[in-house]
Amino acid sequence: MYDIVFLAGGWGAAYDLGFSDTLAAGISKAYYSGSIIGAICHGPLGLINSKDKNGNILIAGRKMTGVTDKQVKELNITMTPLHPEEELKKAGALFEAKTKFLDQFAYHVVVDDEKRFVTGQNQNSGHETAQRIMKIIAESS
């Protein structure tokens, strides 16, 4: 297994990550194998269908972030089938975000309490998301 599984975002992720049963099963397997799971932008959509050992949604009750509904509207990409803020909330995640004049200029990184999921709000969060993941890896070694 891997130390880290990372889901990059981008608008294309809205068309496939949240619909893939194979990815959902892989995320669950990675989680139970001890991997740290990171995602930015639309990448967290790949987490919404992963299940725990009891069949419950794995991310329910966990702090997470991703692209905001406000940013989806600002970028005029409402035609995409899945929107991270909306879908993470539906999955029971505790959604957090920062806002600015335009959300595409904001950035925010969230680490869940267990330090197993590290999510970044948008493309501006990539560097800090990676740094946080590497810090968790270093502290656990």
Give the predicted meaning of each segment.
Residues 1-141:
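Active-site-adjacent pocket-lining segments in enzyme domains
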